[in-house]
Regions:
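Generic hydrophobic transmembrane alpha-helix motif, especially the helices
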Residues: 22-38, 47, 51, 158, ...
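Membrane-water interface at transmembrane helix exits
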Residues: 28-31, 50, 79, 83, ...
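Cytoplasmic-entry segments and transmembrane alpha-helices of multi-pass inner-membrane transporters
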Residues: 5-12, 52-67, 166-205, 282
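Transmembrane alpha-helices
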Residues: 2-58
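An internal, D/E-rich "acidic patch" concept
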Residues: 112-168
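Short, membrane-interfacial amphipathic segments enriched in basic
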Residues: 44-58, 112, 116, 128-142, ...
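Alpha-helical transmembrane segments of integral membrane proteins
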Residues: 59, 149-182, 198, 221-359
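Hydrophobic alpha-helical transmembrane segments of membrane transport/permease proteins
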Residues: 70-120, 214-228
Length: 359
């Protein structure tokens, strides 16, 4: 049986190597005659074909990549046609431009084309990393997104890191002190933080710490400007991770192998951290994807409350200014990040627990 599996693995490796060789050959010889888009499609298909033959994990990754691409496409389609269905247009303002200027603007932004043609042109731009041009500023959306994303990435990164660290620590404390004062206090506050939306928490933090206590400036460009937005973003996911860690920890500590380790005289700290906490973190890892989605969507409103100048601020400004390319670009960009984060969290889940079989 083992010999058969070994031969099967060797055969998969040989086929994968051949496909990689073909992939290199296609890329080398087809470059002068194929357009960039066709070459990109061929390379992607061949790479996924090679990955598909590497085993159950490779097939799972291929399926998830295809599903991710389909999801982003559907979101792009819904966003595009929703923007086109809204009454008026990006240039429908109180002081409308003259007919000549209106015609020039419509031609520049392809608004004089049929909706189907506009969608095809928009998809072609997305394939090349081009999100269009802002109807408000005239700048490329991709440039604005990547300039603003640095701020959003810092806020989201700090919020996610603190949420995971504090959530795991508080959840472990609650599990080890079940039904005691520490457990009840932690569960009370985590329930409260889960129930309060991030934008309300952001407003409360602004009122208390900026206007009442004057601990932080309302408008700031230094590191102080990150403190309150990070707290507003991390409280809810931290609370959820705390409750998740507590439940998982209690379940793991009740397993037979934990009781066996304690019976053999293994130190309590070693039992908890080496055997208990490691297995208790598996559900937390699966929550990383949804947590990323929560932080990204929550940052849109939180950033506008604190005027941090991040991607969320640009998104809200796009809505206010009827800047449709900005709205579509930020929506698709954030959707891509969410899909990618969910895929990566599933793969990390597999690495942490090798027993998971994707078949």
């Amino acid at each position: 049986m083992e010999l058969t599996e070994k031969k099967k693995t060797e055969g998969q490796m040989i086929i994968t190597g051949l496909i990689c060789a073909v992939l290199f050959g296609v890329g080398w010889f087809a470059l002068p005659i194929l357009t960039e888009k066709i070459l990109l499609g061929v390379v992607l298909l061949l790479a996924m074909g090679a990955l598909f033959l590497t085993g159950s994990t490779g097939r799972y990754i291929c399926k998830r990549i295809l599903l991710a691409l389909l999801t982003v496409f559907i979101i792009a389609a819904i966003t595009f046609f929703t923007m086109n269905a809204i009454p008026g247009g990006p240039f429908s303002k109180e002081k409308a431009p003259s007919a000549a200027v209106q015609a020039v603007l419509e031609e520049r932004f392809h608004l004089n084309e049929p909706v189907g043609r506009q969608f095809i042109l928009y998809l072609e731009g997305l394939m090349q990393g081009n999100f269009g041009i802002s109807t408000k500023t005239g700048r490329e959306i991709s440039t604005t997104i990547f300039e603003s994303f640095g701020i959003s990435a810092k806020l989201g990164g700090f919020a996610a890191l603190l949420a995971i660290l504090l959530g795991v620590v508080l959840g472990s404390i609650a599990a080890l002190n079940r039904a005691k004062v520490a457990d009840r206090v932690i569960i009370f506050f985590t329930t409260l933080f889960v129930a309060v939306p991030s934008f309300i928490m952001a407003t409360l933090l602004l009122l208390v710490f900026c206007l009442q206590l004057n601990w932080f400036p309302i408008f700031s460009t230094d590191n102080q400007s990150y403190v309150l937005p990070v707290i507003a973003l991390m409280l809810s996911p931290m609370s959820y991770i705390t409750r998740l860690t507590k439940t998982s920890m209690l379940d793991v500590l009740g397993q037979d192998y934990i009781r066996t380790a304690r019976a053999k005289g293994v130190k309590q700290g070693l039992v908890i951290f080496k055997h208990g906490l490691r297995n208790a973190l598996i559900p937390v890892i699966t929550y990383v994807g949804p947590m990323t989605a929560y932080i990204l969507t929550g940052s849109m409103v939180v950033e506008s409350v604190f005027t941090t100048g991040g991607l969320g601020t640009k998104f809200v400004q796009g809505i206010t200014n009827r800047d449709y390319p900005m709205i579509m670009g930020t929506t698709i960009f954030l959707a891509t990040l969410m899909v990618t984060a969910t895929l990566l969290s599933d793969l990390v889940y597999k690495l942490v627990d090798p027993r998971i079989d994707f078949d």
